[in-house]
């Protein structure tokens, strides 16, 4: 007696719902994660057991490398653009629109304003070397009655730049923004001399900027 052959039907699974879930999860993680900024000079901050968190938006990061050189960056391009324009005016220097874009692309300021034209004439490799070996001047500028340093001028320019951007927002747009002003973070390398950190803090206090956070990395409590 012959065997009855059962016809096999092709199995078809609709993967559309699974794809939707994957896209949703990917979007969630992209929105919730804090991406590391592409900075020329990076530091390894000292460990700390504090649980206070540092803001990831509307921040002015002041970086102090192991040799005490000071650099500056912010998370908002528009803040950097406005601050750069103000600093060029303060230091009586000029850059073309394309040159300004080149400076902003670095996402970190680490050279004197008047050195920027010469800085931009060099190769990218030489530019990176200069950024790593120069820093923003913290000495008082000559011919200024207020005796402010270029570092102090940058801090004020950054804060003013963010304030201008915020004030230009509509009332509806302001409800979407969590910070009304720029928050200052100080990131010093664990090998940075204390005197260099003390100098930066003194420079901030001289311009009435006494609210700031010292950035550290999490460290477990020793049992």
Q: What residue ranges belong to the model's regions?
A:
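Hydrophobic single transmembrane helices highlighted by the model
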Residues: 3-40
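Short hydrophobic/aromatic-rich motifs at helix boundaries and adjacent loops
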Residues: 1-4, 13-14, 56, 172-174
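Long, low-hydrophobicity, acidic/polar, solvent-exposed interaction domains
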Residues: 36-223
